[in-house]
């Protein structure tokens, strides 16, 4: 299925219309429930709910509370192709248990980014895969110095420099003028483009090795099936408890 993904902001309606003319579906990543109506108003077909745990540009709402709200927001809505608007979950998902949790909350699918940074096939900068494997979930930060918008990246000495109270105030002044702090530092020879942030999600804490994409997919599916089997057992147990309780109540009557 041809798919165009808009990750920063709502795409112009004219762009969406042109894509539709060529049979291309449009997915919009959102970080707040109120963004859904704006996205649907321009004809977006799929909503990707990305929690703040995600790598790159993210909002402030975590994945767990965000997904159910987005699912509720699209309920009963149809896209330009006449099908219900699906919700794709994103943000901090790294294994089958996370996928199962998202499906339980009403998502139709998931969007994994950081999990595949460590794939052998990923086209990433030297050392990027190794950084993901070595880092823990607490080793990321959301910061605006690279694009002017909150962006979750790996913590470095450079990002640490910009998180002191004095530098935060300086950052806000630069952004108010439309100046990107990193570019200002590069211009003043206080940084180089090598200091640019490496986007990655808090999922890094659950990623322990570099492997082929095919193995990652196989692991995800095996974990998902195991999680769903656990759900089935739990549901069966609850149903038995309810049946026994109903029978006991009927006997007392």
Predicted regions and their residues:
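Alpha/beta enzyme core
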Residues: 1-88, 95-114
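Conserved active-site-proximal phosphate/metal-binding subdomains
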Residues: 60-88, 94-253
């Amino acid at each position: 299925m041809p798919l165009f993904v808009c990750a920063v902001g709502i795409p112009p309606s004219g762009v969406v219309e042109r894509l539709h003319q060529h049979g291309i579906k449009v997915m919009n990543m959102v970080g707040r429930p109120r963004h859904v109506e704006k996205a649907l108003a321009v004809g977006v077909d799929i909503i990707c709910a990305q929690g703040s745990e995600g790598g790159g540009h993210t909002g402030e709402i975590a994945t767990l509370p965000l997904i159910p709200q987005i699912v509720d927001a699209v309920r009963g809505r149809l896209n330009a192709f006449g099908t219900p608007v699906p919700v794709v979950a994103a943000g901090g998902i790294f294994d089958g248990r996370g996928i199962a949790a998202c499906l339980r909350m009403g998502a139709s699918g998931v969007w994994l980014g950081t999990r595949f940074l460590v794939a052998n096939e990923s086209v990433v900068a030297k050392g990027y895969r190794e950084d993901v494997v070595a880092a823990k979930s607490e080793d990321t930060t959301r910061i605006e110095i690279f694009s002017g918008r909150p962006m979750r990246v790996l913590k470095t000495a450079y990002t640490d420099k910009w998180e002191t109270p004095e530098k935060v105030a300086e950052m806000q002044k630069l952004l108010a003028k439309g100046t990107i702090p990193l570019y200002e530092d590069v211009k003043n020879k206080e940084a180089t483009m090598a200091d640019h942030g490496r986007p990655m999600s808090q999922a890094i804490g659950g990623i322990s090795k570099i492997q082929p994409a095919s193995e990652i997919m196989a692991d995800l599916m095996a974990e998902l099936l195991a999680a769903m089997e656990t759900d089935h057992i739990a549901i069966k147990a609850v149903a038995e408890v309810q049946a026994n309780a109903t029978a006991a109540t009927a006997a007392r009557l």
